[in-house]
């Protein structure tokens, strides 16, 4: 299957390969070929760093193999594509390529996480002329979206790709006009990403560690305080599972930042909340900061270790292996 699946036309849900072939003139003018299954998975960091940079990272699996692509958000040709079958995680694991460089530069210390998976079937069709020569190749794509939080897969609108055949541009133009003007089928969006995210119930950029609350001039101090503290609590809670799973060091970092900001808010916003309540929760959040501190210290040491190695003569770089083992063993306890 051609890895470019996000261009062409959107079809009604009830148009399958046989009906499409009939609409294009029947068996003598449109021949149905093989069908193949494929999957497509979108990736980004937990805090949407690739999205913020206007990039999309995806992994396509088809009978021909597995391919990772980095594309501009507005669609079009990929910036780079590399063959890579393992599940995506750390950019450093990717083959040496522009793709790895670009992704690593944006993600820094963050890991790639799956956003949603598209599973589908691609059916090849051939449009024939009077001499039974193929003048346009078609791919009918039926797809469904799977994602964490969805009880069942959600079906996307079928897509029809038009693949040009050398020497038959006029036939391609004629068919394109027929599908858009006679059938009134809309052009598919240049990027599948937005449709997949909507089906998965995700909003790109729906997480940021930055405090972002809207306070109204007519709010009471108590209401404003609750708004701030609820936002901080939401940030803290969203980072708990990633911290426990040790997906990357930024989950714990963001959890601790939200903790410190909560303690600061409790200290600086005075005479709004009951004093005994403030005292109680200041102690609770102080405890949270204390118990997570040692692990964060280990994270910082491990993040800085490559820089420490680079500062040593080449013959001495391996001398830090024992320190790294010690830090990782302590981190895993």
Regions found by a protein language model. Give the residues of each.
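Cationic, histidine-enriched alpha-helical/coil surfaces that engage anionic ligands
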Residues: 1-333
């Amino acid at each position: 299957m051609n890895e470019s699946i996000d261009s062409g036309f959107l079809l009604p849900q009830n148009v399958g390969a046989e009906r499409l072939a009939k609409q294009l003139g029947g068996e003598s003018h449109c021949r149905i070929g093989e069908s193949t299954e494929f999957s497509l998975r979108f990736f980004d960091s937990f805090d949407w760093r690739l999205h913020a940079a206007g990039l999309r990272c995806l992994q396509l699996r088809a009978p021909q193999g597995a391919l990772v692509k980095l594309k501009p958000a507005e669609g079009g040709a990929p910036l780079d594509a590399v063959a890579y079958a393992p599940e995506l995680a750390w950019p450093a694991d990717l083959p040496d390529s522009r793709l790895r460089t670009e992704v690593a530069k944006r993600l820094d210390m963050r890991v790639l996480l799956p956003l949603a998976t598209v599973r589908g079937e691609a059916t090849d069709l051939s449009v024939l002329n009077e001499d039974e020569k193929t003048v346009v190749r078609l791919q009918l794509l039926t797809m469904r979206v799977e994602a964490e939080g969805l009880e069942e897969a959600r079906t996307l609108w079928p897509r029809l790709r038009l693949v040009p055949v050398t020497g038959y541009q006029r036939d391609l133009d004629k068919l394109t006009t027929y599908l858009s003007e006679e059938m009134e089928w809309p052009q598919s969006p240049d990027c599948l990403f937005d449709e997949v995210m909507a089906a998965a119930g995700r909003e790109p950029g729906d997480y940021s560690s930055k405090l972002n609350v809207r306070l109204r001039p007519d709010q009471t101090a108590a209401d404003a305080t609750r708004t701030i503290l609820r936002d901080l609590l939401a940030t803290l809670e969203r980072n708990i599972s990633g911290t426990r799973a040790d997906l990357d060091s930024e989950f714990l970092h963001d959890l601790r930042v939200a903790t410190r900001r909560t303690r600061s808010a409790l200290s600086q916003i005075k005479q709004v909340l009951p004093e005994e309540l403030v005292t109680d929760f200041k102690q609770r959040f102080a405890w949270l900061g204390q118990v997570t501190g040692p692990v964060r210290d280990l994270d910082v040491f491990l993040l800085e270790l490559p820089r420490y190695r680079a500062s040593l003569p080449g013959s001495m770089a391996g001398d830090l292996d024992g320190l790294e083992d010690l830090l990782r063993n302590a981190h895993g306890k």
